[in-house]
Amino acid sequence: MRLSSSSGSVLPAQAASPEAVEEQKCLNSELWHACAGPLVSLPAVGSRVVYFPQGHSEQVAASTNKEMESQIPNYPNLPPQLICQLHNVTMHADAETDEVYAQMTLQPLSPQELKDPYLPAELGSANKQPTNYFCKTLTASDTSTHGGFSVPRRAAEKVFPPLDFTQQPPAQELIAKDLHGNEWKFRHIFRGQPKRHLLTTGWSVFVSAKRLVAGDSVLFIWNDNNQLLLGIRRANRPQTVMPSSVLSSDSMHIGLLAAAAHAASTNSRFTIFYNPRASPSEFVIPLSKYVKAVYHTRISVGMRFRMLFETEESSVRRYMGTITGISDLDAARWPNSHWRSVKVGWDESTAGERQPRVSLWEIEPLTTFPMYPSPFPLRLKRPWPTGLPSLHGGKDDDLTSSLMWLRDSANPGFQSLNFGGLGMNPWMQPRFDASLLGLQPDMYQTIAATAFQDPTKQVSPTILQFQQPQNIGGRANTLLPSQILQQVQPQFQQQQYLQNINETTIQGHAQSEFLQQQLQRCQSFTEQKPQLQTQQQQQESQQQQQQQSQCMQVPQHQQMQQQKNMTNYQSVPNALSPFSQLSSPSQSSPMTLQTVLPFSQPQSYPDTSMSSLSPSNTSTMHNALRPFSSEAPSHLSMPRPTAVPVPDPWSSKRVAVESLLPSRPQVTSQMEQLDSTAPSIPQSSALAPLPGRGCLVDQDGNSDPQNHLLFGVNIDSQSLLMQGGIPSLQGENDSTAIPYSTSNFLSPSQNDFPLDQTLSSADCLDESGYVPCSQNSDQVINRPPATFVKVYKSGTYGRSLDITRFSSYHELRRELGRLFGLEGQLENPLRSGWQLVFVDREDDVLLVGDDPWQEFVNSVSCIKILSPQEVQQMGKPFELLSSAPGKRLGSSCDDYVSRQESRSLSTGIASVGSVEF
């Protein structure tokens, strides 16, 4: 076993004798990991791992101080990374030197297992590093035959049992066990000038027996069983003379390559030995860690990164660097290998001690958490619930499309793997019938298909005809695809643009049972078509007369003020582009706001097999559909009521988006030519409501335009309606006009419609999206600068904390530990497993402690306490920071918006402003 630990060779599985294994004592895992180092964590038995022969060769070279020579035969059948099943892990320690190493039994996966569409990718075991211990590097006086071992005061008080200070001098006897179970007795005394903690009697015996020298380290651990454990770490001193019994370096290299190649070809088990103190890097890593780093973290030359390194006395430190290149380490022998494929340059002058090349899974790019790209450009504010219908299909090429950034020489086999257990592709989760929740997914699929003008992706023409309400305020008047193309293409010459968009259209789902029932009901309405047309014409004429008579009574200055207000809210009509532009009737709109006529003029459509409806029949149909799409009617040109009614929690989501036009000059010239002849296109169309969520207003004035994409269309963040948020959040002089509004295409005199009066003022949204309370709008605008930040921890209620009370990270961690019952665990996150992250003002998620304190105070928005389990499951990006645990009472609307604007840890995908589902 000593040969195995020092050489790190590969042996067939049969070479490990069961009798020899039984003779090995069960080592203490906590003490073994402490001796191995703070960054070492062995994978879990039974999990899938990735084995790198290159890394194994580096361990042999480091142990023998001899690199692998070129005359060593190559094994073309041995891939640069081998996915294996980890069958067994045994921890060992050398009997003479206490050098720790691990024996692992691996078995390569068969080709059939690699093709498994749901290949498990376990996250591996938790880091078994101890939490209550101290490590000290020995000095010359510590290793001398007199004087004893000086223990730092805080370390002695933390790890050793308390002294009895009634004695003079205070003293006690300590009994500590090493890795082999041997007990060592020391006398612990508190004496001297100044007084200090010393280990006297028994210490020199221990130093002599272990042959410790200055530079070596000693660890004392107080475990959960109230036992004192003792371990040593020897300084990395290169061996000048290898024992004659040890095999040559070339023999070791050939042995490990031959054993791995044979196991890969025969799908048999093989055994390796991992020496964490001698190996430069881990060469057996969990499969999930490999996939997350290689296929779900985007890097580029020039990107900044940080990397953890072990420092003195078992502590760790992050060193900064810059990526200078991405290439194979040994393209001739190991092509397409990800082992040390990243060239880096280190910032500090001591960079000579660190490797010039690193692997992807060893570094942390200075961005948000790793990106999990989706084939659809819509980024959800909340995790997509399991079973809810998604806006895209779960095709096999969805995963591969997100991996196009990889080098062309990358192994395509890994791209076909679906790691569903990590939550990397939520669209692959099982779904149930959306009608159980009262949803109408097909209506949204139809809208998306209509927007891109792909008739093959549409559910049915009859569903499009359901989208023909009569009221202008927040209603849509949708045409069939053939009629839309006839109207739009001659005007805007968009054939090539639509052809490109058709390639990215979304597949619609089958019609829901609800729509089929409503269609059957509406078929009976067609028999009453003449009567309904007559009634509709009478209602329209009466409504027109009432509007004109009321508008005559409005003073002229009030009309001008009303038009001015409507211009301010130009960006917030109930419109959805591009199909708001593609769904106009074939008649022009009036020129003034006071004489607006309804769009719902009778039109005829070709009959379909399911009895298509004319617009005159839709009034009765909307009464039937009202429970699922309840909107209070918009009153055009009516005075604003003083009493604001409480909005319906099922009120529709309304968004206003920019027009899909090639360029401003081209559109302006075209609009001037079409001013007198082309029909005016309404900019209002309604999107049927999704239950339980309301649109939010993006209050960030410096929004990134890439953060507002819906169906591939840029959305102006200021044009998103919030239930009750517009009057309080927008001033009268804040003009947010839609682009191209200077042309006749979106002239204010033609398309200024008042907002729906059912929107209340400054209504507060709770976590479920409903409106439980109402607050004064002045409280939203004139809210004093907040010095409190929200702190969240899973399983408990959130807390508010004034961070200006503290002057350092240590005080903050201590206070958070007291508030959440985590005393002593937040100060040492790497040992306890608990981690602190925060969201800054730019919605980036960062680790607490990396920035200067004052910069952190000025930029922090909220803090999240992550448990060890959450830190383990960082591969599930949609679960972290997506929502605060517990119900937070009394929050204002802007607090709610700021929480929803926080980006999650796994995602990194551009936000869609305030669109929520």
UniProtKB/Swiss-Prot annotation:
Low complexity: which segments have biased composition?
576-594, 604-620
Alphabetical keyword list: Auxin signaling pathway, DNA-binding, Nucleus, Transcription, Transcription regulation
The Gene Ontology terms for molecular function here are: DNA binding
Where mainly located?
A: nucleus
| Keyword Nucleotide-binding assigned | no
Query: Which compartments does it reside in?
Result: Nucleus
Instruction: Provide the residue span(s) of the region labelled Disordered.
Output: 571-649
Q: In which tissues is it expressed?
A: Expressed in roots, culms, leaves and young panicles.
Entry-linked SUPFAM superfamilies: CAD & PB1 domains (SSF54277), DNA-binding pseudobarrel domain (SSF101936)
Give the record's GO CC terms: nucleus
* Entry-linked Pfam families: ARF_AD, AUX_IAA, B3
Q: Which CDD domains match?
A: B3_DNA
Q: Which InterPro entries match?
A: ARF_dom, ARF_plant, AUX/IAA_dom, B3_DNA-bd, DNA-bd_pseudobarrel_sf, PB1-like
The PB1 domain, residue ranges? 786-870
Free-text comment about domains: Interactions between auxin response factors (ARFs) and Aux/IAA proteins occur through their C-terminal dimerization domains III and IV.
Self-association or partners: how does it assemble?
Homodimers and heterodimers.
Family, similarity comment: Belongs to the ARF family.
Per its record, how is this protein called by name?
Auxin response factor 17
